[in-house]
A protein has these predicted regions:
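Conserved, mostly hydrophobic/aromatic
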Residues: 6, 46, 75, 106, ...
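H/E-rich (His + Asp/Glu) clusters that bind or coordinate divalent metals
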Residues: 178, 186-263
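An N-terminally biased module of ancient metal coordination in phosphate/nucleic-acid-related enzymes
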Residues: 1-59, 64-66
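Glycine-enriched alpha-helix->loop->beta-strand junction motifs that scaffold or abut catalytic
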Residues: 108-114, 133, 137-144, 173-177, ...
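Active-site gating/metal-coordination segments in enzymes
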Residues: 52-53, 61-161
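Hydrophobic faces of well-ordered beta-strands that scaffold small-molecule active sites
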Residues: 3-7, 54-56, 86-90, 113-117, ...
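Distinct, well-ordered alpha-helical segments
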Residues: 66-69, 73, 98-107, 127-131, ...
Length: 263
């Protein structure tokens, strides 16, 4: 089964009915010249890559923006369109006093599957004490965490807050929690590889598209930035497929990855 572990549903039509909110979301997340798409069309696009399940990642920086770019309620709404296909993740802005309560609600009542955090947007390091209450809730409910790692293309984001090595203490303190450092932590690819090798609970995904096309960037990252045999010999079971849609169509990501010929 092909699972896309990195979809940002900013353009999903069920949550784009309010034009002003849609435009604000696209501005915050740096999505431009894009239009909403129906669930039916999106699923046809996923089918071209053989994708049978997708992870939907929200965005909550509401402490500064006033409302989440993509809320937990909106994620829940999309999941309800096809619960066998969509897997919803939660987000909670740790700068808000209500963050822990919101995450508890997401896990206990909305049945969301994990937590997504973008520390680059939050302007805090992964070991900021305000985040630990959220990590504790993930541990309590046995839910994974997907972190933005490396460069974030979203507005008002600073990559220094999500350099892969900054996550090591969290990986060490929470061995029971599976943690994904997304985007292979690009451009700090070797730092990500080192953490994948050391920590059983550390994973990454292939959601990256920053230079060239998918054929070129994947070859550069997985056979040049890493040793040519690192993936096959050491960390193949730590790398999950993720397209990073809507910045790139999933079928392009999948074909680029397949071109490497990994078993």
């Amino acid at each position: 089964m092909v699972i896309d572990t990195h979809i940002r549903p900013a353009l999903f039509s069920p949550i784009c009915e309010n034009k002003e909110r849609f435009e604000k979301r696209c501005d915050q997340m740096n999505y431009h010249l894009m239009k909403p798409s129906s669930i039916e069309l999106l699923k046809k696009q996923y089918a071209l890559a053989g994708i049978e399940k997708v992870f939907l990642l929200p965005s909550d920086c509401s402490f500064e923006t006033g409302e989440p770019d993509i809320s937990n309620d909106e994620i829940e709404k999309i999941v309800q369109c096809d619960p066998t296909f969509f897997v919803g993740f939660a987000s909670a802005d740790p700068r808000k006093e209500s963050a822990a309560e919101e995450l508890e609600k997401a896990f206990k009542f909305q049945n969301l599957a994990g937590l997504y955090i973008n520390t680059a947007r939050l302007h805090m390091y992964p070991c900021d004490e305000r985040l630990f209450v959220l990590y504790d809730i993930c541990k309590k409910y046995k839910r994974p965490i997907i972190f933005q790692a490396g460069l974030s293309m979203e507005n008002n984001s600073l990559a220094k807050y999500c350099r892969p090595i900054e996550f090591e203490e969290v990986l060490s303190k929470y061995p029971e929690v599976n943690i994904c450092l997304s985007h292979v932590g690009w451009p700090w690819v070797q730092e990500t590889a080192a953490l994948l090798l050391k920590y059983e609970n550390c994973y990454t995904n292939t959601a990256l598209m920053n230079f060239d096309g998918p054929y070129q960037i994947y070859k550069k990252v997985f056979t040049e930035d890493m040793g040519a045999l690192w993936v096959e010999h050491n960390i193949a079971d730590k790398i999950m497929f993720g397209s990073g849609s809507p910045r790139i169509r999933p079928v392009r990501s999948k074909r680029g990855l397949d071109s490497l010929g990994f078993s």
